[in-house]
Amino acid sequence: TGKKNILIDTGTGDKGNDKFKDIYAIEHKPIDKALAIAGISQSEVDIVINTHLHFDHAGGNTIMNKDGGYIPAFPNARYIIQKDEWFDAINTNEKTRASYRKDDFLPLQEAGVVELIEGDREIEKGISVLKTPGHNRNHQCVLIESGDKKAVYLGDLVPTASHIPLPYIMGYDLFPLETLENKKRILNKAADEDWLLI
């Protein structure tokens, strides 16, 4: 925004070993270098919005300190997370356990930088979250408004351009019929109002 630096999702981070990177075909591109291209340092990020806390979207939330513990990667940011997503990430089951790494989010709570929200909400002027369950129970998209222009960051509601057709839903979405309903809702609104899809 004009006054705040807001980052949506932090990627996988650099916690995984070589086997982890091979399994998920991860190409490590340090987020600090990507931010530097935009002229921003990690300490200048004011808000991080996590669409959800799976490791591929929240892995860069934290970094290892010199003592081997984890600290917030964006030390001056508040992290916006759906309250029920936080609960689900802490209370995993056999199906969801592999998607969450507690080192990606528990250190944020210890540092006092987590802001838990419920449902749709304006975060800052022109930046809102829209709860869009389907991929998991508490996924959220981010709506960006500037003047008469709007864009929506879809996260794993529509993870690739190939997933734009309504029936094309990832096989590992926990609630695929909810994904379908939320895709209809968001994509129809985007088409009606000429939103940019991100």
Question: Residues of each region from the PLM?
Answer:
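Feature marks short, surface-exposed loop/turn motifs that line or immediately flank catalytic pockets
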Residues: D14, H57, F87, A161
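Metallo-beta-lactamase
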Residues: I26-I40, E44-D56, I71-K131, N136, ...
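Metal-dependent catalytic neighborhoods of phosphoester/phosphodiester hydrolases
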Residues: A58-G69
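Active-site gating loops and adjacent loop-to-helix segments of metal-dependent hydrolytic enzymes
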Residues: D18-K19, L157-D173
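Active-site metal-binding loops of divalent metal-dependent hydrolases
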Residues: T10-G13, L53, D84-E85, G134-N136, ...
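Divalent-metal (often Zn2+) His-rich catalytic cores of metallo-beta-lactamase-fold enzymes
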Residues: E122-K125, L143-E145, K150-A151, A161, ...
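Conserved beta-strand hairpin/beta-sheet module of binuclear metal-dependent hydrolase folds
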Residues: T1-K33, I37, C141-D156
